[in-house]
Amino acid sequence: MPLGLLWLGLALLGALHAQAQDSTSDLIPAPPLSKVPLQQNFQDNQFQGKWYVVGLAGNAILREDKDPQKMYATIYELKEDKSYNVTSVLFREKAQKCDYWIRTFVPGSQPGEFTLGNIKSYPGLTSYLVRVVSTNYNQHAMVFFKKVSQNREYFKITLYGRTKELTSELKENFIRFSKSLGLPENHIVFPVPIDQCIDG
């Protein structure tokens, strides 16, 4: 199964950029979890709803100036068992259609941490961790993702916004945090805001 399909919303279009690289190239190592903060007193009911992906950074994400990544949205829907139904909606420009990636995030060992539900249904995927780094719930959030696929470790940080634009201060903070985890500038992108598919 192609890497792009395995990402299933972790990197979405960013994964396609990664496929263009030499598949034998070395990935930037994932940081120890001790370097990744966890939002204190995480409020799962306040976190749910639609988030726009304002920033993306990761060891399989590369900035493409000629074909910049388009913004997509992710909707978190809290279920009675405290897991989330998570739907990412993106616009496929060539096909001129909306794509939907649906998965379940199951509560992990502490509030604000999650694993992927039904992980065995994703071939080659052996672990998947989601950690909410910080959020104020009504404006912005930073979320860390780490997975092991085909025995390779991938990680990503997403900057979410309740709106398509965030302050330069929040973006700078996102860049600083991404760099603190070992990612250089060309592995940090700010998707271009669009209207197709992600509004409504």
Feature map (PLM): residue ranges:
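A beta-rich soluble binding module of mature secreted/lumenal proteins
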Residues: 1-200
